[in-house]
Regions:
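N-terminal anchoring/stem segment of glycosyltransferases
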Residues: 1-83, 97, 101-106, 160-164, ...
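A structural signal for well-ordered alpha-helical segments within the folded catalytic domains
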Residues: 25, 86-90, 195-203
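A residue-level signal for conserved active-site and pocket-lining positions in enzyme catalytic cores
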Residues: 31, 92, 116, 156, ...
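Short, hydrophobic beta-strand segments that form beta-sheet elements in well-ordered domains
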Residues: 36-45, 109-116, 134-135, 243
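Short, polar loop motifs at secondary-structure junctions
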Residues: 41-49, 60, 117-124, 140, ...
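Short loop/helix-cap segments at secondary-structure boundaries that form the rim of catalytic
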Residues: 47-54, 123-129, 236
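GT-A fold catalytic core of metal-dependent nucleotide-sugar glycosyltransferases
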Residues: 84-151, 155-163
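Catalytic core and acceptor-binding pocket of nucleotide-sugar-dependent glycosyltransferases
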Residues: 161-273
Length: 273
């Protein structure tokens, strides 16, 4: 086993609305501080002049553009937020196939971190470097029935070989997410409200647990890797390695768009551990 801070990693995220651009920049600053040797790939959009939704992608070799294979227009409704979160599955499949080889010559290792996430120290997740692994915080509150336990996709690590079990899940997740971009909002079986990308991924990994070539599923501690702050005071949760500043509280519902959230960047940054 090795800690992830001792392994090559491609860390990625995107911001698909101008309101998220500064969030993405702030998140990446914390990654550079705590994991200066990781490869970083980011996207910002929408970019004008393309038929389908398009992001400008910043790679180590320069900039390029990636366009979704389906079209949608932001219309100011709640569905905007859900369409954008469904882009995550497609984005991760793009990263896996085009860029993940940067992480390791024979093993892809890609980590997603939401733009509103902030690292507070070096991540200490332990991985078997040659295993097929999906690692993420899970919501497993004792008061929640086991069938409703689910992935929290603000931070996800995918590790595996080309053509392996993890790649198979990524392909299906991307296809499901792309399909749901064009569907009306559907209820989630795990949380109140419509389902999003993490619901689709949870269903896939749960169905694959019985497969003979299944991957290892690491359920990381929710409070440590998905530290949700106090919404009233803005105080971060003690003992976290990732603070998640939950921009959905401002961006999901149209009536919340003018909400004074999250706190200013300088108020969110913590001393290095």
């Amino acid at each position: 086993m090795k800690r992830i801070d001792q392994l090559p990693v491609v860390l990625t995220s995107f911001a698909y609305r101008e309101e998220y651009f500064s969030e993405l920049d702030g998140m990446m600053a914390t990654v550079r501080e705590h994991h200066p040797n990781w490869h970083l790939i980011t996207g910002k959009g929408p970019v004008a002049g393309f038929e389908n939704p398009t992001l400008e992608v910043e790679l180590s070799a320069g900039k390029t553009h990636w366009s979704l294979p389906v079209s949608f227009q932001l219309d100011g409704t709640e569905q905007d937020w859900h369409r954008i979160v469904f882009m995550k599955g497609w984005w991760m499949a793009q990263i896996w196939h085009h860029c993940a080889v940067l992480a390791d010559g024979h093993r892809n290792r890609v980590m997603w971190l939401d733009a509103d996430g902030r690292l507070t120290g070096k991540l200490d997740v332990e991985l078997e470097p040659d295993a097929e692994v999906i690692a993420s915080p899970w919501w497993t509150d004792p008061g929640t029935p086991e069938p409703e336990h689910h992935i929290c996709s603000g931070m996800i690590i995918f590790q595996g070989a080309r053509g392996g079990a993890v790649e198979s899940i990524l392909k299906r997740w991307a296809a499901d997410c792309i399909a749901h971009i064009q569907l009306p909002l559907l209820p989630s079986p795990f949380v109140p409200g419509p389902q999003g990308d993490q619901c689709l991924l949870t269903k896939l990994v749960k169905s694959d647990l019985a497969a003979p070539d299944k991957c290892t599923l690491l359920k990381l501690d929710y409070d440590k890797y998905c530290g949700v702050p106090d919404y009233k005071t803005g105080a971060p949760k003690p003992g976290t390695l990732i603070d998640q500043w939950m921009m959905n509280e401002k961006m999901r519902l149209p009536e919340d768009r003018n909400r004074n959230w999250p706190p200013p960047e300088e108020a969110r940054r913590r001393p290095s551990k």
